[in-house]
Amino acid sequence: MLSKFSGSRRDLQFVLLLGILLAVLGISLFLAVSMGSVAIDLGDTYRVILSRLGFPLEMGEVSKSTLAIVWNMRFPRVLLGLIVGAGLSMCGSVMQSTVNNPIAEPYVLGISAGATLGATLSIILGLKLVISLGAFLGAILATIAVLIIASMQGRMTTSSLILSGTVVNALFLAFSNFIISVGANADSVMTIKFWTMGSLAGTTWSDLFLPTMVVGIAFLFFATQYRVFNAMMMGDEAALTLGIPLRFYWYLYVTMVAVLTAVLVATCGIIGFVGLITPHLARGLVGTNYRRLFPVATLLGALFVVWADVLSRVIIPNAELPIGIFTALVGAPFFIYIVGGRRREVRT
């Protein structure tokens, strides 16, 4: 009886937390659209968005320029930040379970390095219209290389995945730096630097379709996999004892994370540390059960990127910084904290 009561209480707390996070996310969307180099009245933002979504609201004295800024420039940008943040957080949650390592995120497999190499080649060759395609192909190539190297000894393990990801990451970054050193001019270098630090600038409504579809499908699938994730977190031997075909799920999850990350990176460049930070924050709120952790981490990731993008737009007047700077400023100390905590656990 007591266990049933405590279980129902945890479920109630979980539902309440989801409601709070959704409400905060909804409010954040309106606030984020209102903030920028040109400040927009929150009431005008509210009227423009809701009226465009079909609600019967009078536009009042909203100017055409305000309408264009809110609906054509900022709202799609904020929505893309939400989608990218949710997607990167999902990837981090899945990777930390798949390799049973709390410091794992999509980039641990060298996916970002592959995307960087593909984008760098596109920029150097003057193919700026296909930078996203180059980044996508580079990310997929890196993932294939990781899976091949990890399976070279016949049996892929979590350790072999991490080690092969480290090797591929170093190799692809070395190739990128070599190409930049021998073939880049000043304009290309600036383009590469800005792209590799991530940006949501210039987002249009047409940019939303592919990442929204991919993130939505991935969320619906991964949300049903919590039993497998929980088993993986207990270790390889425990998962095998429970009848989990680890090799199948490793290939499946790593491939899906690679495709998802490649789509997101191809859309907005490299935004690091999101997949590292938000799953840990979710664990602090709801524990380690992936039935609760996964949706909470997804919402936290969306919030994190939305507000990181706001900072990139407002911290310097009349200028915009890459969003990756702010995620790194938060993520790097967080990474050090996690590593320090793991070392203390080992010593004790």
Where are these regions (language model features)?
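Alpha-helical transmembrane segments in inner-membrane proteins
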Residues: M1-T348
